[in-house]
Amino acid sequence: MNIKDIKKINFFISEKKNKNIHLIGIGGAGMMGIALILLKLGYKVSGSDLLESLMIKKLINLGATIYLQHSEKNIKNVDFIIKSSAISSNNKEILAAKKRNIPILLRAEMIEILMSFKKGIAVSGTHGKTTTTSMIADIFIDSGLDPTVINGGLIKSINSYAKLGSSSYFITEADESDASFLYLNPNIIIVTNIEPDHIDHYDNSFKKLKQTFLIFLKKITLYGTAIVCIDNNAICDILTNLKCKIITYGFNKNADVRIFLYKQNNFIGHFYIILKNNKKLNIILNIPGKHNALNAAAAIALAIHEGINNDLMIASLKNFQGTCRRFEFLGFLSIDQGFDKRANCMLIDDYGHHPTELSETIKTIRISWPNKNLIMIFQPHRYTRTYNLYHDFVQTLSQVDVLLILHVYSANEKFIVGADSLSLFNDIKKLGKNYVTLISNHNMILDTLIQTLQGNDIILIQGAGNIDTIAHKILIKKTKKVIK
């Protein structure tokens, strides 16, 4: 879709609020935020997905009509459609829409339309987008700037994926997985890092992925700003020839916003930010990990650039509640091991599904709880990712004490030989560094888990598929423990 088409659709939306907007894949993390904003703006919203969730119930309560199946009947009275990137071209509703000449927009195209009259701030990168966007949202809200926000995860402070604000600020997570972020034209772009992921969409070329990020950055005008992590080599490779202002952040001594003296105690991260004028800021975070210090540094760089009061910014970060499924502490479990013996375990839930994300989570746990028995329940996500990063997965997954590995969550991808959980299990077991077992039936999780408990355990639920709902239901049901 070109700019002229977007302008036509923009006029169509603004002038015809009685028209019906239908979102295919409305339950996806990236789609729910758009649906919330459209409902708040007063549009008629319908949508379809395959599974019910708390957020889908919330959308229904706000007035959306949602179908828990895909059918051409769902778009009977639809004027145009927004599709998730997870929806295939042969989806029944997509095919029916094409026959009826109903306009179809990608998620990113819709965000660009919503953002077009605002000061757009886009948060991109392989890792850390959702947490960084959440931090920025909190800082702007706490500073009274009332932004509009669309995030890829639940922001705990507002208990939502999105917020409609009254100010000129529009903050959004920008998705690089299918290069759709190139539809966006923000004033400010943050790039947290660039690593090989989703490279099947880039002809299996990391170079092409980096070049796409460069194209995205070059969309910033002369009066815009790029805020980038100087610790990441791939980012440094593409910073040449940008006409806009560049602000760097990181642990690197040359960073404009530099992290200094990072320390960690349990769930608390503490560090200083050193600015170019040698001013020092004392930062306390309620979430641990150097990667989260980097996320905070990106938010700090933006806040300073926008003239937000330092004290308000520091207080906001100190009160930051985190993001759903990003190193989320769910509580303690007391699990009956039999023979009047119980194991008290910490339960942590994390969305990370890339080897780098897994590695950072493991490091964070080892720093704060070095003597704990670390048990990871892991569900690989996508055959393509498992195939492309196979060696890294094997090495990283061998770093936990106990690994319970579920079958790959395919996300509708076709099976790839050698990129399955059985192959991972066999190769990790060969290393002999940890106890690893393959979970072929979800009902085996608790029984297998009980055999590995030592009484000083951390249970880490890890993955981006449906592992969170599977593990939560089993653990809560079997232990009869309400997780906070």
From Swiss-Prot:
GO molecular function: ATP binding; UDP-N-acetylmuramate-L-alanine ligase activity
Catalytic activity of the protein: UDP-N-acetyl-alpha-D-muramate + L-alanine + ATP = UDP-N-acetyl-alpha-D-muramoyl-L-alanine + ADP + phosphate + H(+)
Family annotation (Pfam families): Mur_ligase, Mur_ligase_C, Mur_ligase_M
Binding sites annotated in the UniProt record for ATP: 125-131
UniProt xrefs under InterPro entries: Mur-like_cat_sf, Mur_ligase_C, Mur_ligase_C_dom_sf, Mur_ligase_cen, Mur_ligase_N, MurCDEF_pg_biosynth, UDP-N-AcMur_Ala_ligase_MurC
Top EC class for this record: ligase
Nuclease recorded as keyword: no
Pathway annotation from the record: Cell wall biogenesis; peptidoglycan biosynthesis
Gene Ontology biological process: cell division; cell wall organization; peptidoglycan biosynthetic process; regulation of cell shape
GO CC terms, sorted: cytoplasm
E.C. code: 6.3.2.8
Subcellular localization(s) per the UniProt record: Cytoplasm
HAMAP family (UniProt xref): MurC
NCBIfam families: murC (TIGR01082)
Family under the similarity heading: Belongs to the MurCDEF family.
The protein's name: UDP-N-acetylmuramate--L-alanine ligase
